[in-house]
Amino acid sequence: MATPRKTASKQGSNGILERLGLFGLGKIEPVILAALASELPLLLIGPHGCAKSMLLERLAKALALEFRHYNASLLNYDDLVGYPLPDEHGSLRYVQTPASIWPAEAVFLDELSRCRPDMQNRLFSIIHEKRVQGIALERLRYRWSAMNPPPCNSAENDAPESADDSVGYAGSEPLDAALADRFGFIVEMPSWKALSVTARNAIISHSDCMVAPAMAQQLHVAINDARAVSAQLEKAFAKQLTEYTRRVVDHSYTIGIELSARRANLLMRVICSVHAVRYTNDPLADLGESCWMALSHSLPQRAQGIRIPDGKLLAAHRDAWKIAQLSEADPRRMLAAESDHVRRALLALLLTQSTDAEASAHVADALAHCKSGAREAFALHLIEHAAIGRVHVAVAEQIAELAATTQREQTFNTSIAAGSTRHAVGMHVECFLASLVQSDEHGLLRNLVISLYARDEKQTIKSIDRAIASWVEMRARFRIEKETARAA
């Protein structure tokens, strides 16, 4: 596979924003520069006072762009296009004002989430296709927007991931899904609390910072270098990145995030741009890390007020990237094709090509996805078939502990105060135990039910019944698969 040619420039991209007087943005600098190199629409999301406007204004100044900054919450359409006036031929032309958008090279639509719906619809074509009323904005290159975090829709018991997640902004509404999906980059700005002490001190002591010509030139060079390398990357890694993108987008549906076909196409371009920026600064930059950086900064759900399950997203990224690096003949590709977590774990244990670490990860993942009852049945199956020799100690201990709840003789204690919920559940358990017959299989189930009741006082009749059903279903599944294998 060809490696992109390193550009001749000796100017690295690392620390450019800091040298422009923008401190604490090092982690998102490759993403910001990638947005400049690709010229894809950029949306910044962050709390008030986190330098969203300063960042974009300073970039426009450094690049010497004809710049328009509009407050979308106050914007009237005439402010944007000028005033309509019929000419002598009866055609409609617009009388431009100093604020008109027509000569702009960069447009910043601030407070986009506070914009009136009718105005937001009119801004849609600017963000999406650089047009107003169907007329092309010939000089427009950059489309930037900013907004405060919208109210976050999450599960009732979800806790905010950080203190900033709990901050609400009156009037900041989630963006329409179609509009949010037009932004190539959706970047969360760091809040004051997220900054290092050094960055905080720098912000305090550098209230104003002039853009030196040398720094402006360095920004130009970094953008041009990244733009050239991005095109090479797209050719050199097309197959690998296409597979990664497809797999991670497919996997996103399983974690509650729906990414569109447009997003898949945009993600590929974002990955190439982000890695191009990182590569021009460090030819040894890891492509997988660039994929993660691109993915985590291009999700429209962040603008829609939909909480991103970051842990699950990272797992989806790792799975997709791992498979994308495998050769076509590698048997481990079967693992990626298998959607059932339990079957995938068993397959990983059988494949000699999978490492012990990979097998352990698949087993741990399967245990995490199994419901109560099914989890214990899966653990017991692994013990019965001596299949834990390849898993790491921590996972093996978890398996042994789960299996022991069914193998160890359990004692049922009914000395609970009458009339309580706990007593009602206990009576339900007692009735179920009385229905079991003397057999090895029912003995395992008996131990499981008593263990579930004893170790968790929050168990309900429904949760006990669900665990029993899950156990029975998983045990039956293993029996059927065993009989099928024998018949074959």
Task: Please provide the spans of the model-predicted regions.
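Conserved alpha-helical scaffold flanking the Walker A/P-loop in AAA+ ATPase domains
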Residues: V31-A35, L85-V107
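Terminal-proximal interaction/regulatory segments of ATP-powered molecular machines
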Residues: L314-A488
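Canonical AAA+ ATPase core
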Residues: R114-M119, E129-L219
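Walker A/P-loop
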Residues: L36-L75, L85
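Walker B catalytic acidic pair
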Residues: D110-L112, R122
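Loop/turn-to-beta-strand initiation segments
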Residues: L40-P41, P103-V107, I135-W144
